């Protein structure tokens, strides 16, 4: 009992709560700005923790992480501009709500789903972290390849009514990902100048395809009176929405947690896998892509589930689940702490304070989210003549901020033109982003697995985890083909 009270006292001390609140608020603002990812936010604000105690510093960084993943949904819903890669799936359906005057409802669904996904990941963090972390360590190159292939199969389900167009777009995304230095042989591929040696970055491409293309489209009718309905009819989800959220978000939150445990698989993958799972569970899969509450709930539950999942291997094994967790390891090291099994023995109170702090951060996030929905939706009442230049500026700043490279700005502009042209011929842009994100992961692990096995393809059928992913791939493809035949 004294241990539990010590944990509660540590997590709920006024100073720690203040730092967590500040972290969540900063994270939401960072996440809502296109191009400023959760990783960038945590990295930029890491120096602020140097003078803090370990508990305050780590929980403030966790607050930034939780807030940024949720914050990406705000611009995704209001402007069709994912603030972070984790919200790319949210933009598909979320923006459809805004177009029909239901932005408040969509933000409410996203906020509650984010909270539920985060809470599910916190429960997993508390209850089964050691066991799940051990499972994640069993992932070899073969398992990572099949995970990436499973993610790529989602392209078939997010392609809308024309699977062929979606598959072509996804293939182009994969092809784009091959530009740069080969990760296995270091051979230079498809590079015209030094700027392409590191490859085509997916964040400028994502900003271009989603945001800049939308800005170009807006320019065409900038003086028209056909504005998006900015009225806020609801600030909370309907009863039916809540039922949908309670059915979908816990499942996708659990999926996101499992994805987060796997090193290298981030919130963007958790979001798309959750989206695809919900589509398979839905009685009305044809509504996905047209403004489905299930779709928004699934995406946000999945990406916020990753936040707790990524902490599991970090704390129990000292292995980062994603880039943010890697920064967290650095923050702990600065405090003189070494993440891993010994941390549970030497600093048990701190570990369980982090567990409880994740729950508190998610609670602060949901309270801030619902409190500010009306403020968020004011963006829609801004005239197009003002909003469009602002979107242009955000796109330029967001694409430049990642590497401070104007070449990325050019990449974003080219992607924007391509996305605008794709919209003209009704080709979905989401498959290209998915291909660009998962293509390198699939290629690298496919080739590494074959190198380790001396070219024997049996390596992809050796373990129960491989068979599990093969079954998921078959199920996903079967469902997509059956849906197209109908």
Model-inferred region functions:
Residues 108-224, 334-484:
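Membrane-embedded alpha-helical modules
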Residues 66-71, 112-124, 132, 176, ...:
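Membrane-embedded alpha-helical segments of transport systems
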Residues 24-38, 68-80, 155-160, 253-263, ...:
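Transmembrane alpha-helix interface/packing and boundary motifs in multi-pass membrane proteins
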Residues 55-59, 96-113, 283-295, 323-326, ...:
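Membrane-interface alpha-helices at helix entry/exit sites of multi-pass transporters
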Residues 1-57, 130, 137, 188-292, ...:
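Helix-loop-helix hairpins and the membrane-proximal interhelical loops
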Residues 38-48, 61, 76-96, 127, ...:
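Re-entrant/interfacial helical elements at transmembrane boundaries that shape
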Residues 65-76, 83, 292-317, 321, ...:
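A structural-propensity feature for long, helix-poor, extended segments
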Residues 30-39, 77-88, 120-124, 259-268, ...:
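Short helix-coil transition sites and intra-membrane helix breaks within transmembrane domains
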């Amino acid at each position: 009992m004294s241990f539990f009270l010590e944990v509660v006292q540590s997590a709920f001390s006024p100073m720690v709560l203040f730092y967590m609140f500040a972290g969540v608020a900063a994270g939401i603002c960072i996440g809502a700005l296109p191009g400023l990812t959760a990783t960038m936010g945590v990295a930029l604000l890491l120096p602020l923790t140097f003078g803090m105690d370990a508990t305050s510093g780590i929980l403030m960084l966790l607050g930034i992480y939780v807030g940024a993943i949720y914050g990406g949904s705000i611009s995704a819903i209001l402007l069709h501009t994912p603030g972070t890669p984790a919200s790319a799936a949210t933009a598909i359906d979320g923006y459809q709500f805004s177009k029909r005057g239901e932005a408040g409802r969509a933000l409410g669904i996203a906020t509650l789903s984010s909270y539920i996904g985060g809470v599910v990941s916190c429960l997993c963090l508390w209850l089964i972290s050691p066991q799940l972390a051990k499972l994640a360590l069993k992932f070899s190159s073969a398992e990572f390849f099949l995970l990436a292939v499973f993610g790529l199969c989602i392209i078939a389900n997010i392609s809308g009514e024309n699977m062929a167009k979606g598959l072509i777009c996804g293939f182009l995304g994969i092809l784009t990902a091959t530009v740069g230095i080969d990760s296995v042989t270091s051979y230079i591929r498809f590079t015209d100048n030094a700027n392409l040696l590191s490859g085509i970055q997916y964040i400028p491409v994502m900003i271009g395809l989603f945001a800049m293309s939308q800005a170009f489209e807006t320019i065409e009718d900038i003086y028209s009176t056909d504005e998006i309905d900015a009225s806020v009819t609801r600030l909370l989800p309907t009863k039916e929405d809540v039922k949908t959220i309670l059915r979908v978000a816990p499942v996708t939150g659990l999926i996101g947690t499992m994805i987060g445990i796997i090193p290298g698989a981030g919130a963007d993958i958790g979001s798309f896998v959750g989206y695809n799972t919900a589509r398979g569970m839905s009685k009305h899969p044809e509504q996905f892509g047209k403004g489905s509450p299930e779709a928004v709930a699934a995406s946000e539950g999945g990406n916020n589930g990753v936040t707790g999942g990524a902490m599991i291997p970090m704390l129990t094994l000292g292995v980062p689940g994603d880039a943010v967790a890697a920064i967290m390891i650095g923050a702990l090291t600065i405090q003189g702490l070494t993440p891993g099994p010994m941390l549970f023995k030497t600093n048990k109170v701190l570990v369980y304070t982090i567990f409880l702090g994740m729950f508190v951060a998610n609670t602060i996030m949901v309270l801030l989210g619902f409190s500010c929905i009306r403020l968020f939706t004011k963006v829609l009442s801004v005239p197009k003549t003002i909003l469009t230049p602002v979107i242009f500026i955000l796109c330029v700043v967001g694409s430049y901020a990642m590497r401070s490279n104007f070449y990325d700005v050019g990449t974003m502009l080219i992607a924007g033109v391509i996305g605008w042209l794709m919209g003209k011929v009704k080709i979905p842009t989401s498959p290209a982003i998915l291909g660009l994100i998962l293509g390198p992961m699939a290629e690298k692990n496919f080739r590494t697995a074959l190198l380790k096995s001396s070219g024997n393809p049996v390596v992809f059928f050796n373990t129960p985890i491989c068979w599990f992913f093969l079954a998921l791939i078959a199920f996903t493809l079967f469902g997509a083909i059956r849906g197209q035949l109908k």
